[in-house]
Regions:
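Charge-biased low-complexity segments
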Residues: 4-7, 18-131
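Repetitive helical segments and hydrophobic/amphipathic motifs
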Residues: 11-12
């Protein structure tokens, strides 16, 4: 009896380990990308990239782009948000905050018919008008 249990465990253990590894893997390419309501997403980004006058006074006029990378997990939650570049003036942190404060729900990415963690990238553009 002990031999049967031991043999069963030896057979099942590799599959359990592979499944655990798959759940932790973050996909870069997927069959279906994670998505959210585009109208709500665009409105959120537009609203959150409006800089207050106190910040505009401290930054030279111009257009500043911050590329943000984040992960949408299998439940549609956003995490691991980071700026891939920093134009300075605290704009990278502001861009990360744009993503982290979004309250809309994400649909996770899909690979082989199941939800998976996947990277997303979003450019955040700040426009500072000439004074």
């Amino acid at each position: 009896m002990k031999g049967i249990i031991f043999t069963s465990l030896l057979f099942l253990l590799p599959f359990m380990v592979l499944k655990a590894q798959d759940e932790n893997k973050v996909f870069e390419k997927v069959e279906q990308n994670a998505n959210t309501n585009q109208k709500t997403w665009n409105e959120h980004i537009s609203r959150k990239t409006q800089l207050p006058d106190s910040v505009i006074k401290e930054i030279p006029a111009g257009t500043y782009k911050v590329n943000i990378q984040f992960v949408v997990d299998i439940h549609g939650n956003v995490g691991q948000i980071k700026a891939k570049n920093d134009p300075g003036y605290g704009l990278a942190k502001m861009a990360v905050d744009v993503i982290s404060t979004y309250k809309g729900k994400w649909q996770p990415a899909n690979q082989c018919g199941r939800n998976v963690k996947a990277y997303k990238e979003q450019p955040i553009i700040f426009i500072v008008p000439a004074q």
